[in-house]
Amino acid sequence: MASNKQKLAVSILNFLKVSMKEDAENAESLQVAVECIRDVFGVDENDSTLQVSAPLSEIFDKFIGENNTNTTTTTTTTTTKLSKEELLNQTYSEIPYELLESFKQFITILEQKGAFANEDSCETVIKATKQKFMESKAGEVKAIAEKLKNEGNAKLNEGKHQEALSCYNKAILYDNTNAIYFANRAATYSALQNFEKSIEDCLEAIKRNPNYGKAYTRMGSAYTSLGKFSEAMEAYNKAIELEPNNETFKASLANAERLAAAANNQAPAMPNIPGMPDLGGLDFGSLLSNPAIRGLANNLMSDPKMKEMMDNGDMASLLNNPDLLKMFGNLGKK
């Protein structure tokens, strides 16, 4: 049975063959189009089973006529164009402060030469001007972005996460080719408990540098905090593949594996320990579905001292760890 797609192809072929008779100058080009359509759709315009009741041009004219008269279904979309001043102010916000006066002088020269006389082309001219200016100042722009990255690192270390985020945002605005900027912003998003955004930035970092191990391990940490242990282990394994001697990466992988095991198996009752509430029968799998608990457990398990206690089987010291007691103490109050 002939398909509508084949019938449409034949209608187009018939239209092109009529056009060849009316436009001898382009007949050769139209013939090439006819042959291509025949081959692609595997049809023959002489096949009676593929013919429709009216030629394509008539169907088209009827459709256009009906839509032009049916004003009740016509939707008009209006787009408000920005003025030259609005476009310039928007562009100024994307220029490093240190270079802003220089850019404004550049704009003034262009204005004097009449570059913005045509309102319809203002946006195109301004965008091209910005691109040309930033390219001419590439070295300075990269230096400014690097300075912002360093400021962001300092803010992150001080626990000023929103200020750090602002620094990394600007660094990326000025130089979006640097994988480190995205990876550092990913760390900031994780600190702000926005693990989905952290993963997005890790992926952006990996696009720019597929061999950047730290981007994979930060992505693994974000996945761990979301309880997506399979994805976390995959990310950590990739980081280790890139840096096989990195012990921190290996410890992070081991941590994700432990958390995955805990999530899949309900732990046995915990012994009573002075200072710790009765946790018998506590469902650790359910607990680990809580992002706050996962994040705290992730940090604790990444502590080298905690790892050493677990590896040595020193459960007494482990269970009397002040941080662990605090975590379980808080759980007992919930």
Curated annotation (Swiss-Prot):
Family: Belongs to the SGT family.
Classification via InterPro entries: SGT, SGTA_dimer, TPR-like_helical_dom_sf, TPR_rpt
Residues in the signal sequence: none
Alphabetical list of PANTHER family matching this protein: LD24721P (PTHR45831:SF2)
Family annotation (Pfam families): SGTA_dimer, TPR_1, TPR_8
UniProt repeat feature TPR, residue ranges: 145-178, 180-212, 213-246
Purpose of the protein: May act as a co-chaperone and regulate the ATPase activity of heat shock proteins.
Superkingdom of this protein's organism: Eukaryota
GO cellular component, one term: membrane
SUPFAM superfamilies given in the database record: TPR-like
Protein name: Small glutamine-rich tetratricopeptide repeat-containing protein
Annotated GO biological process: post-translational protein targeting to endoplasmic reticulum membrane
GO molecular function annotations of the record: molecular adaptor activity
Alphabetized UniProt keyword annotations: Chaperone, Repeat, TPR repeat
